[in-house]
């Protein structure tokens, strides 16, 4: 499904110009910028997800499709990470939507969404908080080789990996399903 387009406000537009000038090699193409930059827009996107995508989230949460980057993913991580959305609010709204649907929204959608937010995202956040800064430099396998350009350009020859790299380069976003 096609996502709503968020027209950048004046401050966002000026920040985009600064990013382009100061960080020309950063991930993401600013022509694809479609992210909320305030609480109200982030809340609206949460509501839009629950209205338009939530019902199919459970069936497609781990799916990848090179022709449809976002599919039924919530795209809420940047807002949770930056504090524009609160995990508890997201979970409560998802529960409310599920119960009001009287069975229209499948249990795998609500369970999958809540598990991703609470059971995975918040758990890993706790792991980071508990173990940083030493966790940042752990290298269990003691690998020392540098990655070649294929790993930055999406030309490794491994199609799902290449697709994920290219999407990161285009959108500065990769669905969690690529990381499983």
Label the model's feature ranges:
Residues 179-180:
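Conserved small/polar residues in nucleotide/adenosyl-binding loops
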Residues 132-176:
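Active-site-adjacent "gating/activation" loops or surface patches in catalytic cores
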Residues 118-133:
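Conserved alpha-helical segments that form or flank metal/cofactor-binding pockets of metalloenzymes
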Residues 1-115, 124-125:
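Glycine/tryptophan-enriched, flexible segments
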């Amino acid at each position: 499904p096609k996502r709503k387009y968020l027209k950048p406000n004046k401050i966002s537009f000026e920040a985009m110009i600064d990013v382009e000038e100061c960080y020309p090699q950063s991930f993401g193409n600013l022509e694809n910028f479609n992210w909320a930059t305030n609480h109200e827009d982030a809340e609206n996107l949460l509501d839009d997800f629950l209205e338009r995508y939530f019902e199919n989230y459970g069936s497609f949460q781990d799916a990848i499709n090179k022709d449809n980057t976002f599919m039924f993913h919530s795209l809420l991580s940047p807002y949770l990470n930056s504090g524009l959305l609160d995990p508890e609010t997201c979970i409560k709204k998802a529960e409310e939507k599920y119960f009001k649907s009287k069975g229209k929204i499948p249990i795998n959608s609500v369970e999958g969404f809540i598990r991703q937010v609470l059971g995975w995202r918040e758990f890993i956040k706790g792991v980071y908080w508990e173990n940083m800064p030493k966790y940042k430099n752990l290298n269990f396998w003691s690998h020392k080789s540098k990655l070649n350009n294929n790993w930055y350009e999406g030309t490794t020859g491994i199609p799902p990996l290449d697709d994920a790299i290219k999407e990161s380069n285009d959108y500065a976003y990769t669905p969690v399903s690529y990381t499983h």
